[in-house]
Amino acid sequence: MSVNMDELKHQVMINQFVLTAGCAADQAKQLLQAAHWQFETALSAFFQETNIPYSHHHQMMCTPANTPATPPNFPDALTMFSRLKASESFHSGGSSGSPMATSATSPPPHFPHATGSFATPSWPTAASPPGGPQHLQPQPPLWTPAPPSPTSDWPPLAPQQATSEPRAHPAMEAER
């Protein structure tokens, strides 16, 4: 039961090449033989699809099975996500009169007294009056969303995007 050690090494290399590249065993053997059994050279030749002479000329190099045909295009994916609207999953007609749908597309409130990036709410800083907070006068809201209008000028559109697609949310653009 004497097994040629070189033949055994070659068979192991062929099997490893098949697992790594995802190609057929006969193609792996041809690539390894052409690269003088240098594994990395044969693997590089396989992924670069260089012209290596084959004994069967009708045989084409196969695409590796463990890689996608085309990698994902992340800017396109971000563009698609920016086109999504929160109201679309609940209302088929797009934007409705609900405050939630309107606040998603309305400009943020402007607080002239704010000094930082966050506005301080106008809550009383002193202790509650006797009897508890139920006797406080209701404060008028600082900002009320405007009703939706078909000719709304918010969000502003870039000139080249005015007819093709809506502009992404500013927070989404900051992450790009």
Swiss-Prot record:
InterPro entries cross-referenced by the UniProt entry: UBA-like_sf, UBA_8, UBALD1/2
Region described as Disordered: spans on this chain: 88-176
Composition bias, Basic and acidic residues: 166-176
Protein origin, superkingdom: Eukaryota
Comp. bias (Low complexity): 88-105, 120-137
Pfam families reported for this sequence: UBA_8 (PF22566)
Positions with biased composition (Pro residues): 138-150
Family listed: Belongs to the UBALD family.
Record protein name field: UBA-like domain-containing protein 1
Organism: Rattus norvegicus (Rat)
Gene: Ubald1
